[in-house]
Amino acid sequence: MDHRTPTPDNPWLALRNLTPARIALGRTGTSLPTGAQLDFQFAHAQARDAVHLAFDHAGLASQLSDRGRESLVLHSAASDRHQYLQRPDLGRRLNEDSIATLRQHAQANPGGVDLAIVVADGLSALAVHRHTLPFLTRFDEQAAADGWTCAPVVLVQQGRVAVADEVGELLGARMTVMLIGERPGLSSPDSLGLYFTYAPKVGLTDAYRNCISNIRLEGLSYGMAAHRLLYLMREACRRQLSGVNLKDEAEVHSLENEDSANQKGNFLLGKG
């Protein structure tokens, strides 16, 4: 504090460089500084916009096609955004036209597949637009050697997490992966969530799903998310289950892990 800035120094200020969280905002009297208040209002507006942003399924389907991936565009039983937000149950099921489309595809491609990837707007189409393709690129790179068979990428408008169960059941998929926009936060309007289910069928609860959340540049990297998903897929097939009975114990190779492995004794007591 000096004569030019007559406010006390904030010892938390240096921590702002380490996180996008709203910490060390400062104060003016008993209130927030104007800048911090405006930033809050802007972040809140971004979160609201993310919820109501329309899902550009046509653009995403075109980008997938450019990368050699087939896609199917479907719709949940929620007719529009207003109904989707007020009736979560309708977002968990497909409409009749979409069910017919999947049945026709399954009849034309009998035998089922290992994996059905479903993409839905959820509560942030912005997250889906930004992160779906980069994640799938990294996933394909890491999964190439495993020989998984995949259904076309299914794009569901006004979809919620559980709609992937119906998609997987109709396609005869052993596993489903749902990529969906998470509820926006004040510092993360574009967070992508991933939900993995083994033996999908209508009526499963969240206890049968594994979640990998906050996939974005400022959160969990695409490569790490793909690494964890592949671990879950391998373990789910080996143990024939998913959800609360399947823990994410994927090994992550890093400098910190290597240092820990090489260090002997208790780190609290120093090197032995």
Curated annotation (Swiss-Prot):
Cofactor note: Binds between the large and small subunits.
Enzyme Commission number(s) of this protein: 4.3.1.7
Residue positions binding adenosylcob(III)alamin: V161, E182, C211
Pathway the protein acts in: Amine and polyamine degradation; ethanolamine degradation
Cellular component GO terms, alphabetical: ethanolamine ammonia-lyase complex; ethanolamine degradation polyhedral organelle
Location(s) in or outside the cell: Bacterial microcompartment
Top-level EC class as recorded in UniProt: lyase
Cofactor(s), names only, from the UniProt record: adenosylcob(III)alamin
Pfam families: EutC (PF05985)
An individual GO BP term: ethanolamine catabolic process
Any coiled-coil regions, as ranges: none
Reactions catalysed: ethanolamine = acetaldehyde + NH4(+)
Keywords per UniProt: Bacterial microcompartment, Cobalamin, Cobalt, Lyase
GO MF annotations, alphabetized: cobalamin binding; ethanolamine ammonia-lyase activity
Function: Catalyzes the deamination of various vicinal amino-alcohols to oxo compounds. Allows this organism to utilize ethanolamine as the sole source of nitrogen and carbon in the presence of external vitamin B12.
Family: Belongs to the EutC family.
Subunit structure: The basic unit is a heterodimer which dimerizes to form tetramers. The heterotetramers trimerize; 6 large subunits form a core ring with 6 small subunits projecting outwards.
HAMAP family for the chain: EutC
Protein name: Ethanolamine ammonia-lyase small subunit
Record organism: Pseudomonas putida (strain ATCC 47054 / DSM 6125 / CFBP 8728 / NCIMB 11950 / KT2440)
